[in-house]
Amino acid sequence: MTQELKSKLLSFFKFIFATALFIFVIFTLYRELSHINFKETFIQFGKINRLWLVLLFAGGGLSLILLSLYDIILVKALKLKMPLIRVFRVSYIINALNSIIGFGGFIGAGVRAFVYKNYTNDTKKLVQYISIILVSMLTGLSLLSILVVLRIFNASHMIDEISWVRWILYIVALFLPIFIFYTVARPVDRNNRYMGVYCTVVSCVEWMAAATVLYFAALIVDIHISFMTFVGIFVIAALSGLVSFIPGGFGAFDLVVLLGLKSLGISEEKILLALVLYRFAYYFVPVMIALILSSFEFGNTAKKYLDNSKYFIPVKDFTSFLRSYQKDILAKVPSFSLAILIFLTSIIFFINNLTIVYDGLYDGNHFAYYIALAIQTSACLLLILNVRGIYKGSRRAIIYAFISIILIASATIYTYASFLLLSWLIIIFVLLILAYQRAQVLKRPLRFKKLAFMLLLSIFILYLNHILISGTLYALDVYHIEIDTSLLRYYFWMTIVIIMLLVGVIAWLFDYKYKRPHHSIDLTLCDAIIQKYGGNYLSHLVYSGDKDCFFNENKDSFIMYRYKSNALVVLGDPIGNTKSFESLLEAFYQFAEYQGYEIIFYQISDQYMPLYHNFGNQFFKLGEEAIIDLTTFTTSGKKRRGFRATLNKFDDLNINFEIIEPPFTQDFFDELKFVSDKWLDGRSEMHFSVGQFTQTYLSKAPIGVMRDHSGKMIAFCSLMPTYSNNAISVDLIRWLPELDLPLMDGLYLHMLLWSKEKGYKAFNMGMATLSNVGQLHYSYLRERMAGRVFEHFNGLYRFQGLRRYKEKYSPNWEPRFLVYQKHYSLWESMLKVMRVIRHK
């Protein structure tokens, strides 16, 4: 049998053993808990003096400070130049997390190695010392096991009745002398020969502190037994927890304590309550404190420290790669810790709803209590819904949390006024203030998908809350009390109304305060940039007056955009100095992220697609633009006789074409407006991606007009200079609809011939929407669907007809794309673009 196979078999048997043990513990624990009277447990909790609870929780929080002795010994042994106060802070965080997700202490060992390696260049010795600390956590329990075997801590009622307990105690007791002999005989450092002994003493103190906290919890719930006997039971329970490999020994430890105390004639209800209080005091409270410390310990200071650490010098590319992620993780620790604290706060006060309900049952003013219940439930739900926003540093999410904490505090003061809970709310409020000051964004974009998820999550949480309350009331057998049950029925709807009011009012006020209005832009700066660096087929639309412009820091490039529904819809590619485009987009994305806006690019070319890709965007092909090569365009030849026939027809009818240069007279503009109004026939103007029929906009470029034999204007088209590459575009094309003449063909042909005569090289006839989109089997599904629309919905919009019309001019087809951010919906992005185009 190979070594690899042996290793796999050993891992498999370990997994089978741990799983079987876990299942056994769960079933046994379930069987024991099924006999417990939860009503009696709840009543016992109500009788506890709140001052004793505060002292218990304080004791649980302070007990973990003793574990800092491990780190002090480590720092002294390695002679690390690390401030003592920081040693205590880091140690507390490590030990609190290790107690919850320890996995035999390996989590704590890993975090210790990560933190302390920045203070020493002897990594090998550091790892050896950490290994001693890791193993010594068991040696303290081994010392206590010896005392149990010697009956100093008397647990004879368990040892005599359960044979496997005796053998486990013997085995663990033997571990201590072996460990001490080995570490003294073969020390890591001869100058610190007794390192293992010191750590064993600390480990023993650690386990005794945990036993003392549990004993104090037992005394609070009126369990009175000898401390020596109690510690004996605790040691056996702790060994069971270690053997189970479950973090914190959850389940196995509790089961042994329950069985051990129950065999002494103590009621199960009291034991269960003592265990719950112990778990909260020794595990939950330290974790909460550790999360608070993390908010201060790991932030910009830690990141700066890593940058300046003389020991943390990567010697390999892979090390440098890992270091970059370590810095990112450290920077996120404060916001992550606060998010966890907010989530836990919400859970705590959701559970405390039981207290409001219970007190309300026996109070004459039921209505006030259930309003307080609805307010607190709404506030707790808002906290949960904004956990991710707080983690992302959103000011709006933090404001929601502010309001929620105030509402919870108000409900707490009115109902059960717990000093401990109010103190906790004050701490959270202070942390939120600090988070608000360093918040990175105003708000995060609210998308339909996220809104639907939040709605489903809210319903699920409210349902769980209902199950919790109704199940508890049923267990407490309180339904015989005569109350106005309609209040309980309306409680759900009161909660919904309160949430809607809170969310609606805060969102409206926030958007009102930070809404970016449309400002008049500096067209002189746009002119200067376009004249110096050139434009594109859409750059002339900057004069339409319905867009904002975003400039880079050097003021040598800009983009045109419109704000709509929490989105910034950008028209076309950036304009200006191409070397500045990346910095321009980076600044624009930072601005949008801070404001909480989505970014959508409409009608971009494929020239800068790699640049858009660098910003994590997705692409959708909108269609293709028809670009006519004027150097080869002609009306001569057999294939062009249709063009000549059209031109000859207009000549026969004495219909003339001319280009009118600005400035325009008022009479000329009135003629244009008459034709435009007839052509629109009551329809609304399009916006954003086409020009505006305003005197200001039309005065920026020449206009081609066609007049009949009497001099009456019957058609016109406005031009869009591109200011680059000797290209020109057509913009507005309008004619009198009552005339049965090919006026559109006439305008295009005359414009093409005029442009060629003026020396232009290319003429843009505009885009054929959805043209040549999704034609391959390998295309994206969304593009194949768009292709089907192009093929089969020609009656709704003349997709194919538009392309066929432009095909006769033999253009070159250039693709145009919609660019939208990842995790965003294509259809939502398209709808926002359509709203920008359809509405002014």
Swiss-Prot record:
GO terms for cellular component: plasma membrane. Residues 30-52, 111-129, 183-200, 251-270, 359-366, 414-415, 472-489 are extracellular. It comes from Staphylococcus epidermidis (strain ATCC 35984 / DSM 28319 / BCRC 17069 / CCUG 31568 / BM 3577 / RP62A). The gene is mprF. It catalyses: L-lysyl-tRNA(Lys) + a 1,2-diacyl-sn-glycero-3-phospho-(1'-sn-glycerol) = a 1,2-diacyl-sn-glycero-3-phospho-1'-(3'-O-L-lysyl)-sn-glycerol + tRNA(Lys). It is a multi-pass membrane protein. It comes from the Bacteria. GO terms for biological process: lipid metabolic process; phospholipid homeostasis; response to antibiotic. NCBIfam families: bifunc_MprF. GO terms for molecular function: phosphatidylglycerol lysyltransferase activity. InterPro entries: Acyl_CoA_acyltransferase, L-PG_synthase/AglD, LPG_synthase_C, PG_lysyltransferase. This is Phosphatidylglycerol lysyltransferase. The chain crosses the membrane at residues 9-29, 53-73, 90-110, 130-150, 162-182, 201-221, 230-250, 271-291, 338-358, 367-387, 393-413, 416-436, 451-471, 490-510. The keyword Transmembrane helix applies.
